[in-house]
From Swiss-Prot:
It is found in: Cell membrane. Binds 1 prenylated FMN per subunit. Belongs to the UbiD family. It comes from Burkholderia multivorans (strain ATCC 17616 / 249). It is a peripheral membrane protein. The gene is ubiD. It holds the Pfam family UbiD_C. This is 3-octaprenyl-4-hydroxybenzoate carboxy-lyase. It catalyses: a 4-hydroxy-3-(all-trans-polyprenyl)benzoate + H(+) = a 2-(all-trans-polyprenyl)phenol + CO2. GO terms for molecular function: 3-octaprenyl-4-hydroxybenzoate carboxy-lyase activity; metal ion binding. Pathway: Cofactor biosynthesis; ubiquinone biosynthesis.
Amino acid sequence: MKYKDLRDFIQRLEALGELRRVTQPVSPVLEMTELCDRVLRAGGPALLFEAPPGYAFPVLGNLFGTPRRVALGMGVDAGDDAALDSLRDLGRLLSALKEPDPPRSLKDAGKLLSLAKAVWDMAPKTVSSPPCQEIVWEGADVDLHKLPIQTCWPGDAGPLVTWGLTVTRGPNKPRQNLGIYRQQLIGRNKLIMRWLAHRGGALDFREFALKNPGKPYPVAVVLGADPATTLGAVTPVPDSLSEYQFAGLLRGSRTELAKCLTPGVDTLQVPARAEIVLEGFIYPQDGTPAPAPAGAPPRPAGQAAAAYEHALEGPYGDHTGYYNEQEWFPVFTVERITMRRDAIYHSTYTGKPPDEPAILGVALNEVFVPLLQKQFAEITDFYLPPEGCSYRMAIVQMKKSYAGHAKRVMFGVWSFLRQFMYTKFIVVVDEDVNIRDWKEVIWAITTRVDPVRDTVMVDNTPIDYLDFASPVAGLGSKMGLDATNKWPGETNREWGRPIEMDAKVKARVDRLWQDIGL
């Protein structure tokens, strides 16, 4: 099933019993978070809040709160197990696009050409009179306070845009970048753009500031895109492929785009059927900025991007389950808001796992497996436990072939995808350990690990900025545990032989089990 826009997806979810309309008044200040959190933990449906008090826009929450709904958003209409299998197929497609195998025959060459043609055929197309521009607010009419932007936790600094797809472009780059960055509301037309230094939007901005000092940087933020585009923005798409193109592959039809209306921002294109679009700029700092408040970190300095308007962001409750510290980020000034008639505001919250990002992580885990196996054939399975705050812990199952092999795999995973620079802990086990069962993983650690021999510590590596356990923001250490059986050269001891019952005895007890009535 393919969905041309968010409304199409909502209709399908409702038909499947995967969406519930909430007609009672529920406030976007704390109440939506509490209700969505309870529903997500119970494996419940997406929620469409139709009557947020004081607002004219319904709010969509918990949209990707189960792996099945993530798979549905990618066009896979199946139960949870089949959906996860289909996500592995998606990973195989991505691995083929990222690093295609050389053809070994004319038949293989034909398959490669067919894949290349499929990608080319999904190039996005621009349309005129798009639905996302049916209503336009500009000038004094621009007021972000009219949108039901959630305040998620009691200690949050204010309302927070959470599901905005931020569209940017670097200088002289044909490809646009889509990224999801939280944005703090600080005024009628101002948001703080919290993008970390290594993310695509921040890289585009820094490159622009270096090449065009003193010029406003155009940005668009999309709220309520079709599910394929939204999920394309969080999937490890190869650099040679745009997220819009990838969304077309998921959807089975070319992504329809519209040029932004604001002069200077009209170099950017947004999904034509999006619910709401914010258009504007990050402006250079006007005059001398006020000094940083007492106790706050120093203002950014020494880079071209530092000459642009910045504000102190946070604190906010985050996916770690804690409030993060404050930091300076660029200010996005919204000059125009366009939207569909009867627009829907798409939102979420982040908190102690499980939350929606954790569920997305479970689903995307299945996409990562074929990508890793393409690079490291010895990896037989890979798991990012949701309790590990998305990417902070990874369990790797492998077919070990030589002494030191597990350590090679650790360093390979850390350096493979940008997402894995956040991974603090890697545990490597053999094929006989079910990595999705903590009891088996703990058994392997406690019986196959010597802390001195089998622990790898790596210092001064990139780390999640939100990881307050690291000694320096954005820089910390990593730890690997080799919980595999040890080979000659790794131990001088006779290695333990696992206990296993005789197969004939097990078969007899299987028959007895039924006779006894157990």
